[in-house]
Amino acid sequence: MSDRETRKANVIEALNKARSMELHAIHQYMNQHYNLDDMDYGELAANMKLIAIDEMRHCEMFAERIKELGGEPTSEVAGKVVKGQEVKAIYSSDSDSEDDTIFVYNELRKVCVDNGDILTAKLFETIIGEEQIHLNYFDNISDHIETLGDTFLSKICLLYTSPSPR
């Protein structure tokens, strides 16, 4: 394999690692979306679904770049979905996951730079910025739950109820 092919393979490997992480996030967040909705936390469920959709976009962006480089996008999921989480545990867990993702993506961005692929490095920078927004949201909700507890969660249930038929 030539140096160029080796560098490209390194970048594709980095992209597939990130794609696998995004696939896990999609499954985890959609599972949480369904559970939050079932527990009548509609506003939290709706926001979780929007974040999962962001992760779907990221996953597709990584896949498109992998294909542009001549690689095969992975369909492997990085981890197992944690099911049946208590509402109070979801947001601190997701915050930790997003923090880990940001750290790993920064490392993968460096792999791209070290292998001369600035375009893919910029893709990672863009996605890292969006992951930071998710982290901030999860931290904010986690802090509200920790500080206000059931009062906060009750308010969410009351604010987001289905309209009654008239």
Could you tell me what each predicted segment is?
Residues 61, 96-104:
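Amphipathic, heptad-repeat alpha-helices with coiled-coil/zipper character that mediate oligomerization
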Residues 25-28, 32, 36-76, 137-144:
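Conserved alpha-helical segments that form or flank metal/cofactor-binding pockets of metalloenzymes
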Residues 4-14, 76-97:
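Acidic/His metal-coordination segments adjacent to aromatic residues that form catalytic metal sites
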Residues 14-18, 23-30, 102-106:
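A structural feature that tracks compact, well-ordered secondary-structure segments
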Residues 4, 40-41, 74-84, 106-129, ...:
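Acidic interhelical loop/turn segments
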Residues 160-166:
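Conserved small/polar residues in nucleotide/adenosyl-binding loops
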Residues 45-49, 92, 121-126:
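Short, charged, amphipathic alpha-helical segments
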